[in-house]
Amino acid sequence: MYYGFDIGGTKIALGAFDSTRRLQWEKRVPTPHTSYSAFLDAVCELVAEADQRFGVKGSVGIGIPGMPETEDGTLYAANVPAASGKPLRADLSARLDRDVRLDNDANCFALSEAWDDEFTQYPLVMGLILGTGVGGGLVLNGKPITGQSYITGEFGHMRLPVDALTLMGFDFPLRRCGCGQMGCIENYLSGRGFAWLYQHYYDQSLQAPEIIALWEQGDEQAHAHVERYLDLLAVCLGNILTIVDPDLLVIGGGLSNFTAITTQLAERLPRHLLPVARAPRIERARHGDAGGMRGAAFLHLTD
């Protein structure tokens, strides 16, 4: 059995998957906020319950936001303060007496999609998350590409390309990102960015679902906004795809539920790619909330 944990600031979710990559059992508990000991106990108790349920010693993979293992072997995860700064992988491996593998949650999302039955045919899979922020991951031949600092796929912190300023206007404001830099694309392409762009151009404060509802009703202003957003997304993706050249692009996050993104993006991409380049197949993520657990579990499929 393959056990996958999706750990965030509010919940620890465990999914148990069989050898055919099918979910057989899942359970969620609250994430301890202050006690590292309580955090370790919560994870270990879930593993013990799964081992007893299935009568085997399952493998353990964990997806968590942040940098799973820094140079000194400790976790950096601002949203999981009980475990941040602690040698989580080493401590869990010792307590559970097995090889525990960690990766960040965005890489686990990409890995989950790459191991979908329909998508395993594609050697290079790029996962793109358009949610509260913009992130993603890369999977090559079934294995995540992490980089030395676990930041491979942090597409949201690329800066706006010059073509974006040509599209939006050279007086377009470069917003300061939470990372400290100016003009990171997640400030414009995330769900928050989608809403900010609408407010910037129309001086109306609406959330992304409200704007999308107007678009679905045929509202001309919402239609113009979506066209502008899709053009900006295509411009920014053009740079990324020229570097990565994936076979498959899978889009997740809240905005992936907006069908215009997956259905209308492909026609916009070629003008931003090299003449010899082909746009990848573009699909919406298949596994929703279970994706984090799946990808974490499948860290042990990469041997």
Swiss-Prot record:
InterPro entries listed in its UniProt record: ATPase_NBD, N-acetyl-D-glucosamine_kinase, ROK, ROK_cs
Catalyzed chemical reaction(s): N-acetyl-D-glucosamine + ATP = N-acetyl-D-glucosamine 6-phosphate + ADP + H(+)
Protein EC: 2.7.1.59
Residue numbers binding Zn(2+): H157, C177, C179, C184
Pfam assignment, any one: ROK
Binding site for ATP: 4-11, 133-140
PANTHER family in the record: N-ACETYL-D-GLUCOSAMINE KINASE, ROK (REPRESSOR, ORF, KINASE) FAMILY
Gene3D superfamilies, A to Z: 3.30.420.40
Cysteine-cysteine disulfides: none
Protein name: N-acetyl-D-glucosamine kinase
Record-level GO BP terms: N-acetylglucosamine metabolic process; peptidoglycan turnover
Keyword field contains Nucleotide-binding: yes
Principal EC category: transferase
GO molecular function, one term: zinc ion binding
Keywords (A to Z) from UniProt: ATP-binding, Carbohydrate metabolism, Kinase, Metal-binding, Nucleotide-binding, Transferase, Zinc
Protein family membership: Belongs to the ROK (NagC/XylR) family. NagK subfamily.
Known function: Catalyzes the phosphorylation of N-acetyl-D-glucosamine (GlcNAc) derived from cell-wall degradation, yielding GlcNAc-6-P.
Regions crossing the membrane: none
Pathway(s) per entry: Cell wall biogenesis; peptidoglycan recycling
Signal peptide: none
